[in-house]
């Protein structure tokens, strides 16, 4: 899974330009990331999200979304959605967000708490607002922070979660 993160990040940063670049990257350079060939993974979508234009999906954990009005303050960014399947039982969702302009040169990997199986969109939005590129994952399952029922009978999902 680390290779998937690395491949998406390197490709995105190469198309986005140099450290601290103030010139916006082309929306085409973002959507072009949909053509990336990744081992055991597929880019589901790559889209240029306009400033204030992101709406988070419904959530099992309200803390991963926060106040929906917050997203109106998030600047434009490139959103890459990946599905990784290193095993037949794997279903890992990954998102990588890269600022459209003003990249700080920093990358922030966004984690989850407990057994949480959701992408922390609130923290990713805050990272992009600071000019950081960021990535998050659901660690291969969809569940609340105290629900581990997804692991019963699914040793590969446990491996995905622990990786």
Per-region residue spans from a language model:
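Bacterial N-terminal signal peptides
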Residues: 6-16
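Positively charged n-region of N-terminal signal peptides that target proteins for export
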Residues: 1-4
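Cap/lid segment of the alpha/beta-hydrolase catalytic domain
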Residues: 104, 112-163
């Amino acid at each position: 899974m680390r290779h998937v993160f690395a491949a998406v990040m390197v490709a995105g940063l190469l198309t986005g330009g140099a450290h601290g670049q103030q010139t916006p990257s082309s929306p085409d350079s973002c959507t072009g990331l949909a053509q990336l060939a990744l081992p055991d993974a597929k880019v589901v979508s790559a889209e240029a999200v306009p400033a204030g234009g992101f709406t988070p999906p419904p959530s099992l954990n309200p803390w991963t979304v926060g106040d929906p009005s917050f997203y109106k303050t998030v600047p434009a960014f490139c959103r890459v959605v990946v599905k990784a399947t290193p095993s037949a039982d794997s279903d890992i969702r990954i998102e990588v967000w890269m600022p459209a302009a003003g990249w700080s040169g920093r990358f922030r990997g966004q984690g989850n708490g407990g057994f949480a199986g959701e992408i922390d969109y609130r923290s990713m939005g805050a990272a992009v607002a600071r000019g950081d590129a960021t990535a998050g994952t659901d660690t291969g399952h969809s569940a609340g922070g105290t629900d581990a029922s997804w692991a019963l009978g699914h040793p590969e999902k446990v491996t995905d979660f622990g990786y």
